[in-house]
Amino acid sequence: MTATTPSDKDRVIIFDTTLRDGEQCPGATMTFEEKLEVASLLDAMGVDVIEAGFPIASDGDFAAVHEIAKRAKNAVICGLSRAGAKDIDRCAEAIRPAKQGRIHTFLSTSPVHMKYKLQMDAEQVYQLVISAVTRARNHTDNVEWSSEDGTRTEFDFLCKCVEAAIKAGATTINIPDTVGYSVPEEYFDLFKRVRENVPNSDKAIFSVHCHDDLGMAVANSLAGIRGGARQIECTVNGIGERAGNTALEEVVMAMRVRNDKLPFWNKIDTTMLTRASKVVSAATSFPVQYNKAIVGRNAFAHESGIHQDGMLKNAETYEIMRPESVGVKQTSLVMGKHSGRHAFVHKLEEMGYKLGQNQLEDAFVRFKALADRKKEIYDEDIEALVDQEIAQSHDRIKLLSLTVIAGTHGPQRATMKLDVEGQTRIEEAEGNGPVDAVFNCIKALVPHVAKLELYQVHAVTQGTDAQAEVSVRLAHEGRSMTARAADPDTLVASAKAYLSALNKIVMKRERDLPVPEAAAS
């Protein structure tokens, strides 16, 4: 609990939709194993409701929701469903193994959505709300209904639909700011007025779901809570469609740090926030911006001499929260080529990593090799090394060796050796530059039609011996897969990043059926 005087009426339910709305962010697709890892972490850190996916979207999504439902120890496991009978029944089947399951069904209610998206009139939508909630309630007594594009819905019609949904059995009512259009005062007033005008509003918990198109998702969510909502729908790192969703770590810490103005509490173990951020970043290959609130690299960094002087005298001069409260450690070992296995294991534990014995041995070997090539090893170096080790443990295609010949004369040439599902393949290729030669080698060794959409390089740390971190995004059959890799050799990092994205495509293609129209609530 994070409030000083907790009571049930002040408790805010944290509903995490990283695995559903977060994954709808272009390029943020996660593998089956990555989803299980994220769900396990969310469950352990005290998330109340985990929206694990959209079961009817694909066999892969269904399997992930079903497996997460079986494994969850504490959280309610929720699946998203449109208003159709097949969607609802498929969702019910996916969450059936859960100790606590929820069906989240949604339907657009705004004039623009009803006219152009649904091509239905208000009465048809109203009747569909009733039938959808009724069908969902036949499967479970924990049903959430969302009025998609609720902030642009006519007020009287919104109240009518909310009242009908509660009467049909909905226990949670979500009024989302689907397109990030609202402002805090308006969102506060909307919840206050709906609760005052819907006769049976006391029979359901109201929920906020905000997008960050105007940069106000967190502010709007907190305004909705002040207006009477008691559930916040959010994602780790704020990932999500377009500009993203409300960031879990930001709303949780806002309620904790400013409990004087936001007298609410939740069950989140805030010391796990930084670890959750890193796990989601690694799984999605979406780097966290350095100045991101709460979990960014610079969130607790002070470079100005004046600030440093103040911090040394009293940390409260420039810090409104202790870094330990969100899982950031102030003290650390200086890692280098003389560090032994014990020190390496201690550093990993300090950073929040728990590796199996084989992964640990492989990571240590790579660490020693890196330490021989760098004067100093930073935490970011180890983070990149270990995250890459975890990602590669499920790879079908692995880089064994790479040699590149480049210079001022003639085409550049690359020779590469790959392990492709246990078979060793060797190829040589030329290109217009060394990177082009490397990628041409991969195409020759593993023929594919994926198109390169993004290639970016930046240094993980300072210095001429810094590791290069390469980001690659490949487009394949209407989907984009993004991957990152780090290595002191930029060309090796490029090859590893390309192969990592290719591995994601291979695994996704094997698991999924064609995806229907994406949901957005």
Swiss-Prot record:
Main location (coarse class): cytoplasm
GO molecular function, one term: manganese ion binding
Residue span(s) of domain Pyruvate carboxyltransferase: 12-274
One GO cellular component term: cytosol
Binding site for Mn(2+): D21, H209, H211, N245
Catalytic activity: 3-methyl-2-oxobutanoate + acetyl-CoA + H2O = (2S)-2-isopropylmalate + CoA + H(+)
UniProt EC number: 2.3.3.13
Subcellular location: Cytoplasm
Domain of life assignment: Bacteria
Cofactor(s), names only, from the UniProt record: Mn(2+)
Residues covered by region (Regulatory domain): 398-521
GO terms, biological process: L-leucine biosynthetic process
InterPro entries: 2-IPM_HCS-like, 2-isopropylmalate_synth_dimer, AIPM/Hcit_synth_CS, Aldolase_TIM, LeuA/HCS_post-cat, LeuA_allosteric_dom_sf, LeuA_bact_synth, PYR_CT
Protein task: Catalyzes the condensation of the acetyl group of acetyl-CoA with 3-methyl-2-oxobutanoate (2-ketoisovalerate) to form 3-carboxy-3-hydroxy-4-methylpentanoate (2-isopropylmalate).
Subunit structure: Homodimer.
Similarity remark: Belongs to the alpha-IPM synthase/homocitrate synthase family. LeuA type 1 subfamily.
Name by which UniProt lists this protein: 2-isopropylmalate synthase
